[in-house]
């Protein structure tokens, strides 16, 4: 990444995620976008399900409960995927508008998984 782009990122600008509109964003890979990037805003919540022997379904169930509880913050783009931020994506407060204190953060606690 160029020094210029690093400076832009501290201001909240990612040149691969530019829409043709002044006030609005566009969906990922929509016609008219400049670049193939996208910006994600994250909100954290948790959903609770009973633990079973199917770790995949447990994860899907808890994710869906968290999303329907109150973590959903806007329209999802089902053209490509519903909820992801891949290598072309930019995460607000991590990739752009980053607070350097994030790098010093430690977990409140850790818990060993039984499986």
Curated annotation (Swiss-Prot):
Its cofactor is pyruvate. GO terms for biological process: L-histidine metabolic process. GO terms for molecular function: histidine decarboxylase activity. The keyword 4Fe-4S does not apply. It catalyses: L-histidine + H(+) = histamine + CO2. Binds 1 pyruvoyl group covalently per subunit. It comes from the Bacteria. The modification Pyruvic acid (Ser) is found at residue 83. The record marks 82-83 as: Cleavage (non-hydrolytic). The proenzyme is a hexamer of identical pi chains; each pi chain monomer is cleaved to form a small (or beta) chain and a large (or alpha) chain by non-hydrolytic self-catalysis. This is Histidine decarboxylase proenzyme.
């Amino acid at each position: 990444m160029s020094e210029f782009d690093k400076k832009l990122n501290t201001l909240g600008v990612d040149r691969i995620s530019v829409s043709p509109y002044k006030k609005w964003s566009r969906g990922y890979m929509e016609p008219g976008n400049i670049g193939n990037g996208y910006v994600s805003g994250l909100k954290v919540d948790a959903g609770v399900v009973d633990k079973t022997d199917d770790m995949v379904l447990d994860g899907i169930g808890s994710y869906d409960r968290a999303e329907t509880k109150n973590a959903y913050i806007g329209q999802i783009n089902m053209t490509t995927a519903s909820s992801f931020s891949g290598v072309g994506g930019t995460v607000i407060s991590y990739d752009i508008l980053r607070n350097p204190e994030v790098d010093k953060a430690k977990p409140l606690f850790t818990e060993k998984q039984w499986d």
